[in-house]
């Protein structure tokens, strides 16, 4: 059923996630494991014998190495951005990232080894690109004269969404259908947009509250319920 460029997403409690991964490793192969996402659900239940559970696990496997994946980003917090320096040449605030690798032996690239500003390294960009960035005031130099690359916030997509999701709250009252394990629509929206595109077909073999169907309609996907 799963297409070659498809993904399978399995939502489980932490206590059985290792069983699911073991089964999926056998079916798809360990190399097809993509992520085990931690979704913070809250939870106030007291437990005298162990720590209380406050998250669910979302396990993602692909059928092949051609699976669909569309990175998503969260907007930068304005207050956080304002803590970074302003570049007077571009009138934009920026962070910075390394311009050279600290472990060239891991991935030797002789064509990227050259001397810049008196420092010989294996750089992450070619000498021509380094010169271009320097001339455009897109390099910042530390006290030793080693360059780092300016990353202007206005030119970035935002903060990449990673495998810890603590920004989606549990089901809202207006969404409730009195189904015990109903998932919030925001959660399904994120999953669908990460792993599929418009017109794709999504399968929910359990259906449950039908939230996946609502999300598919909202995001222009087709869906099948069993």
Spell out what each predicted region is.
Residues 1-226:
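Core catalytic lobe of class I
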């Amino acid at each position: 059923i799963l297409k070659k460029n498809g993904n399978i997403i399995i939502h489980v409690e932490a206590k059985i996630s290792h069983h699911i991964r073991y089964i999926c490793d056998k079916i798809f192969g360990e190399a097809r494991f993509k992520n085990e996402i931690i979704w913070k659900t809250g939870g106030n239940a007291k437990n005298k014998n162990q720590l209380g559970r406050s998250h669910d696990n979302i396990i993602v496997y692909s059928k092949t190495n051609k699976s669909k994946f569309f990175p998503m980003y969260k907007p930068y917090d304005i207050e956080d951005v304002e803590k970074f320096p302003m570049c007077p040449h571009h009138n934009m605030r920026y962070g910075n990232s390394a311009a050279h690798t600290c472990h060239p032996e891991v991935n030797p690239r002789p064509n990227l080894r050259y001397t810049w500003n008196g420092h010989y390294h294996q750089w992450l960009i070619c000498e021509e690109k380094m010169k271009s960035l320097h001339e455009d005031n897109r390099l910042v130099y530390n006290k030793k004269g080693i360059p780092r690359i300016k990353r202007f916030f206005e030119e970035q997509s935002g903060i990449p969404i990673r495998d810890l999701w603590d920004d989606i709250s549990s089901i809202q009252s207006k969404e409730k259908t009195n189904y015990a394990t109903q998932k919030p629509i925001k959660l399904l929206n994120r999953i669908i947009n990460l792993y599929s595109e418009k017109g794709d077909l999504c399968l929910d073999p359990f259906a449950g509250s039908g939230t996946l169907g609502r999300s598919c309609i909202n995001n222009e996907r087709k869906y099948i319920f069993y």
